[in-house]
From Swiss-Prot:
Highest taxon listed in the record's lineage: Eukaryota
Name of this chain's protein: Dol-P-Glc:Glc(2)Man(9)GlcNAc(2)-PP-Dol alpha-1,2-glucosyltransferase
Keywords: Endoplasmic reticulum, Glycoprotein, Glycosyltransferase, Membrane, Transferase, Transmembrane, Transmembrane helix
Glycosylation sites: N34, N297
């Protein structure tokens, strides 16, 4: 039997992978250590989340802060996590404020560590489902999982007590349980989806998206558009029993809306549903920015140029539609202008609100929309039904929200990255973590007067 000697490229890829992992972990540890010393008080909305969780840790499950808009999943998780630590360390539950209770719920950093563990330990393991299903033999996938968890929109919340990390983990897990057609667990997927609703109500849209992917994966033969739609409908009917979990989620959500009188649990006056269509373009532009290493090449630019030249009338119509949306469906929420502790404040003030920049912004929206769709097509992991379902899910999730808030784009960003090609993983790792390094420095060293 001949001796097979791995090529130098394989060795370099493996070494690069583990060097990147070590660098990333060191960066995360340093960042968390700095956060624990720097943030002596709750950060922005943390004051509501930490206070509510600490109320639960006093076994008071009846009090609810009306400023909180999301369900109590984060606080239940924090309570269970704290109780587990108490059992393991035999520590007391007494404490108060950020400084009390060394290893309990009353230490803000203990609660923050939930998201750190979730993002750095649990999420990569969940992502392995997608990696194993698609890319076993691809040397280009060595950085795949670490680049997903390095996404700056998500990375920020590893060090704060917010709902975003847990919400994202559960949606990705639910999707992973049905994504690989040889190993599908729809009822378990629906159960995990139900759990995600306890962290963010809009996850009901992503549960519907996951159900559509489950059905689409049942279609084994590639067909034309009309025939695939027909097969999709037929598979939905013949697999109705496997869809029951998702259907139950939707029914329960409708009941919740009826009983609650709306989608948010509190602060209803500041969270009214409005048509904020431009929010989709904000999201697509963010995604395009964070995935620059995947598309910045001559081939992509040439493809975009040819699309414009070969479809001039179509692109003029699209441009007019985008302009109309910018002029008529852009909402400036009072929170956006009132709080200069968010990047969104500066993006709007210095870019989006400047009239002379509108033509350039329109072009950015046009290109990012083109790039999102073409990348999903090129990725080859989703049929046109899957791509259409993704676009609909993004729209239904974002358009009703009047607030420009980049963290709302985390789930669309992560799911997008699951279904596209990543040809330059090392470059992508450097790009993403350079952004993380810059934003971390600003967070820790640039004081903001509010």
């Amino acid at each position: 039997m001949p001796l097979i000697i791995p090529s130098n490229d394989i060795y370099i890829s493996i070494i690069s992978k583990y060097v990147a992992i070590v660098i990333f972990l060191i960066f995360v540890i340093i960042m968390f250590n700095n956060i624990t010393h720097h943030l002596t008080q709750p950060y922005i909305d943390e004051i509501f989340h930490l206070r509510q969780c600490q109320t639960y840790c006093q076994y008071n499950f009846h009090h609810w802060d009306n400023k909180i808009t999301t369900p109590p999943g984060l606080y239940i998780l924090g309570f269970i996590y704290s109780e587990g630590i108490k059992i393991l360390t035999r520590s007391s539950s007494t404490g108060g404020g950020g400084g009390g209770g060394h290893l309990t719920c009353f230490n803000d950093n203990v609660l923050r560590s939930i998201n750190l563990i979730g993002g750095v330990v649990i999420l990569p393991r969940i992502l392995q489902q997608f990696h194993n299903g698609w890319s076993k033999n691809s040397k280009n996938q060595f950085f795949w999982s670490i680049n997903i968890i390095s996404q700056p929109l998500l990375f920020t919340y590893y060090f704060l007590f917010y709902t975003d990390v847990s919400s994202t983990i559960l949606i990705i897990l639910s999707l992973g349980l049905i994504n690989y057609k040889l190993l599908q667990y729809p009822m378990l997927s629906a159960l995990v989806g139900f759990m995600s609703l306890w962290f963010r109500q809009t996850n009901i849209i992503w549960i519907a998206f996951i159900a559509s992917i489950f059905i689409d994966r049942q279609i084994k033969i590639k067909t034309g558009v009309i025939d695939r739609i027909r097969q999709f409908i037929m598979k939905s009917l013949t697999n109705w029993n496997k869809l029951l979990g998702y259907i139950v989620n939707i029914i329960l959500f409708v009941i919740f809306l009826k009983l609650n009188g709306g989608i948010t649990l509190g602060d209803n006056d500041n969270h009214q549903i409005e048509l904020h269509i431009v929010q989709v373009f904000y999201c697509f532009t963010f995604i395009t920015f964070f995935t620059i290493p995947n598309w910045l090449n001559k081939s992509t630019i040439k493809k975009y140029y040819n699309f414009i030249i070969n479809h001039i009338i179509l692109n003029l119509v699209i441009g007019l539609i985008i302009w109309y949306i910018m002029e008529n469906f852009t909402i400036v929420h009072p929170f956006l202008l009132a709080d200069n502790r968010h990047y969104a404040f500066y993006i709007y003030k210095r870019l989006l609100s400047q009239s002379y920049l509108k033509p350039l912004i329109l072009m950015a929206y046009h290109f990012s929309s083109f790039q999102i769709i073409s990348s999903l097509i090129k990725g080859g992991q989703l049929s046109f039904i899957g791509i259409f379902s993704y676009l609909i899910a993004v729209g239904l999730t974002l358009i009703p929200s009047p607030l420009f808030e980049p963290r709302y784009y985390i789930t669309p960003l992560i799911i997008f990255n699951l279904y596209i090609n990543h040809p330059h993983n090392l470059l992508e790792f450097i790009w993403l973590n350079s952004i993380n390094l810059i934003t971390s420095y600003i967070f820790l060293h640039k004081g903001i007067i509010w």
